[in-house]
Amino acid sequence: MEFALTLHIEKRKKADVLVLPFWKGTSQPEAAIALHPLKLSLDSVFNTGDFKGKEGETLFLYVEGLVEMRVALLGLGEKNKVSTEALRKSYGCLAKACLGKKLKTLNILMPEFNKTEEDAFIKAITEGLLLPNYVYDRLKSKQEEDDEVTLLQKINFISSNKHVLALAEEVAAICDGVYYTRDLINGNADEITPQYLAKCAQGLSQEYPQIKTTVFDKKRLEKEQMGLLLAVNRGSNLDPTLIIMEYKGNPKSKDHTVIIGKGVTYDTGGLNIKPTGGIETMKCDMSGGAACFGTMLAACHLDLKVNLTAIIPATENSVDAASFKPGDVYRSYLGKTVEMTNSDAEGRLILADALAYASQNLKPSRLIDIATLTGAIEISLGSEASGLMSTDDQLAKSLIQAGENTHERLWRMPLYEGYQEKLKSDIADLKSWNGRSGSSCVAAMFLKNFVGKDIPWAHLDIAGTAYVTEPKKYMPKYASGVGVRLLVEFLKQLSMVKN
């Protein structure tokens, strides 16, 4: 995406469309400087009620004498109810309308805001424009011309605020991480394998010297005795990997955030095989790992002053004669034994080994894991929020605030001691699954057993938000890229506190 800034509307250059924003109930665009130099009368539009300025409402007009072929009127809703999310939605609707008309270049008259909110609102507008500006069509052999998607290529902001470009570029850097994440999730599971993810990590470290990548292959995992990750992998003909990417944005500081993303590149459910209606989207079961890639990429683009390590335990959970059998017991990296009571509760197993490894070897100041862990969280929260479980109130508070800032919202769930009781096994130290009752919280409690003592830890369950079958106002169908904007916002706020 290319950005430009024009300080005066009469000096703008040729584009496919001129966008004029309106608050609901007004007939003057924001900012009102637009009408006079344009000599554009919109009385008939408002008198007929064809356009009312409702949130996300878009009306295209064809006006002669302008440098644009079209004028788009964009409704922002009620001015006294404006919020970052309302602006994301309105400009997301605009972006989708422009994509539908195959427009490439936009001249956008920016609304005027008070100084305290201006930066946040400009970022939200840019997010609304960029987040829908994505398509995954590389698997189509040929498309009819009418079906081809033409993405937005250039946005010229018309504004007196000279900081607009810097803010837009910052958002674009984060959205690049979101796109990268979506591509990994949307790709064929036969392509996006544990080995492919390892190559992606190595490719990032070649492109960005700030990243150091280490990959544990199966032989190294056996040496490390990561018994749970290896157990999940037994049914696959593809070896597992453990990917470690280290980014040192503040080498003088000992503060160190470790994020761990579930990387099940395809989840059949194992011998407890998933049914039709539940298995078809299971290429998305590595969404947590993909979000770690996107976060690392954005951290490099933004030159974040933090020390960050991302760990992705990657494997398929496939069906084979060698698949681990429900009821069998395996030893974890930590040494605790686990009775495998359901082969479709595999994500917590590979995360457990990764959490224990990070706790013992990386000296984390905080641990955050992100995973499509339980279907129960989708039943509880739908696609409106991800689940959060945490042992540390301050960490939870910071993540929740980052979620509010980005609208990748989190809802905190409890870690009551009673959930630990459900993990008791007669034949092992722990059992991996104990039925449907409280299953999201019980799964998180299982993970807690593998986190080092006194290490602040948070678990993000994104099973309901990572892959959506209905598009939203500024989100396409399927992979959402959830977690990237949230984690980057958390890291940005952390860098302000620690530096």
Swiss-Prot record:
CDD domains per the UniProt record, alphabetical: Peptidase_M17 (cd00433)
Is Transcription set as a keyword in this record?
no
Query: Do you know which Gene3D superfamilies this protein is assigned to?
Result: Leucine Aminopeptidase, subunit E, domain 1 (3.40.220.10), Zn peptidases (3.40.630.10)
Name any cofactors this protein relies on.
Mn(2+)
Could you say which residues bind Mn(2+) 2 here?
K262, D267, D285, E346
Q: How is the cofactor bound?
A: Binds 2 manganese ions per subunit.
Q: What is annotated as the active site? A: K274, R348
Which residues are involved in binding Mn(2+) 1? D267, D344, E346
Describe the function of this protein.
Presumably involved in the processing and regular turnover of intracellular proteins. Catalyzes the removal of unsubstituted N-terminal amino acids from various peptides.
Q: Which PANTHER family match?
A: CYTOSOL AMINOPEPTIDASE, LEUCINE AMINOPEPTIDASE-RELATED
For this entry, the protein name equals Probable cytosol aminopeptidase
Organism of origin is Protochlamydia amoebophila (strain UWE25)
Q: Which gene encodes it?
A: pepA
